[in-house]
């Protein structure tokens, strides 16, 4: 990046729109469901028909409160809705109902691990609002689908408290994980049920100023998010370095950009509107939203154990590697799978590795995730137990795992019963003969081992396992090999 670039840092904040998985929309009884025929899930409220009046969805309020509790935010006893006016084909009323001045949640935080370091990212606020419709382009014309118009959203606004693309991606991952655990959204990026807008400015390292921010709209993958932030950081720094004596506000004006993944650059969409351009005013058709402390406490009691707490428990109670613990808790279904497996297997480290590495890789190759394959947690526990008890070798265990993923309906015990050829070598006399032969043919390695070169033992074990096609019990191989070398 060059020496000059290293003297600058990013300042990043995220605005995340999350569609709530309610049965109906935020202010109308119309169905809230993705993928239906265009303009079939609408009502007069959705399309802004004269005389139609909004009625607030109680379940959407509960889900917003639940999120506020999950992030330890301050849930407001009194909040209010406002009209945000703008003119666009996907907004039939020409305004959005949002919470501009009095959001339902203020504050809160998201905890994440960034490159091995635990960080806490502060939230500014979370507010309820309704979604817009969707423009669909067909060659030389466009249509509008209002099925999405009125779908309940929470917009989660962070403080400008991230200073690298790695921070932003870790924050986004942790946020998605929390939303999944509390079950208020499916967070499907491809369907647009969670949308990330990132705000970034740069400043000289050590400065506390906040310069004009650029918003990059609708990041639909974490990879693109990281790439866009790095590219925009470079662009802004180069602009400031090119015009060192100009007013910074003129060098990098506040604007909205999009990410072009093919050109690997951010592309200007429009200059930023000011708040007054939206002509905010109090929504006249909705009363103040009042919530009691008792209601908030009742909602808080329904919170499950959250990812960060679970992560710390896995490291402490199960003594598993931090990177594997992070993978396990990232998805509540995977975490549940692991915890169920621990009831049958106490080798937690091996279990975590088999779930997050061996089985995860095999399932991904088939477009699946382990908890949704039909493979039972008890079967993975059984596989690890078989290895620990010497029933099978690690090599054979991987063959069994291949068969488990291929069939999605057989336990290790079932597979061994149907394929006895997978069982380990039990002929001790034959194994002794192989060990004796390997020792006789590799006298140099034997001498190296006796002279203190521990790697030589691994080489000799490898030769024996190769000749037995991985079926020799490793523990017995070591016993016989050491005995054979002592007798030389």
Curated annotation (Swiss-Prot):
PROSITE patterns the record matches: GATB
Pfam family name, one: GatB_Yqey
Reaction(s) the record says it catalyses: L-glutamyl-tRNA(Gln) + L-glutamine + ATP + H2O = L-glutaminyl-tRNA(Gln) + L-glutamate + ADP + phosphate + H(+); L-aspartyl-tRNA(Asn) + L-glutamine + ATP + H2O = L-asparaginyl-tRNA(Asn) + L-glutamate + ADP + phosphate + 2 H(+)
SMART domains: GatB_Yqey (SM00845)
Keywords: ATP-binding, Ligase, Nucleotide-binding, Protein biosynthesis
Highest taxon listed in the record's lineage: Bacteria
UniProt xrefs under InterPro entries: Asn/Gln-tRNA_amidoTrfase_suB/E, Asn/Gln-tRNA_Trfase_suB/E_cat, Asn/Gln_amidotransferase, Asn/Gln_tRNA_amidoTrase-B-like, GatB, GatB_C_1, GatB_Yqey_C_2, Gln-tRNA_amidoTrfase_suB_CS
Keyword Oxidoreductase listed: no
The EC number(s) this enzyme carries: 6.3.5.-
Enzyme class: ligase
Gene Ontology MF terms in the entry: asparaginyl-tRNA synthase (glutamine-hydrolyzing) activity; ATP binding; glutaminyl-tRNA synthase (glutamine-hydrolyzing) activity
Biological processes annotated in GO: glutaminyl-tRNAGln biosynthesis via transamidation; translation
HAMAP family found in the cross-reference section: GatB
PANTHER family, alphabetized: GLUTAMYL-TRNA GLN AMIDOTRANSFERASE SUBUNIT B MITOCHONDRIAL AND PROKARYOTIC PET112-RELATED, GLUTAMYL-TRNA(GLN) AMIDOTRANSFERASE SUBUNIT B, MITOCHONDRIAL
Annotated function: Allows the formation of correctly charged Asn-tRNA(Asn) or Gln-tRNA(Gln) through the transamidation of misacylated Asp-tRNA(Asn) or Glu-tRNA(Gln) in organisms which lack either or both of asparaginyl-tRNA or glutaminyl-tRNA synthetases. The reaction takes place in the presence of glutamine and ATP through an activated phospho-Asp-tRNA(Asn) or phospho-Glu-tRNA(Gln).
Similarity comment text for this entry: Belongs to the GatB/GatE family. GatB subfamily.
Quaternary structure (record): Heterotrimer of A, B and C subunits.
Protein name: Aspartyl/glutamyl-tRNA(Asn/Gln) amidotransferase subunit B
The organism's taxonomic lineage, starting at the top: Bacteria, Pseudomonadati, Chlamydiota, Chlamydiia, Chlamydiales
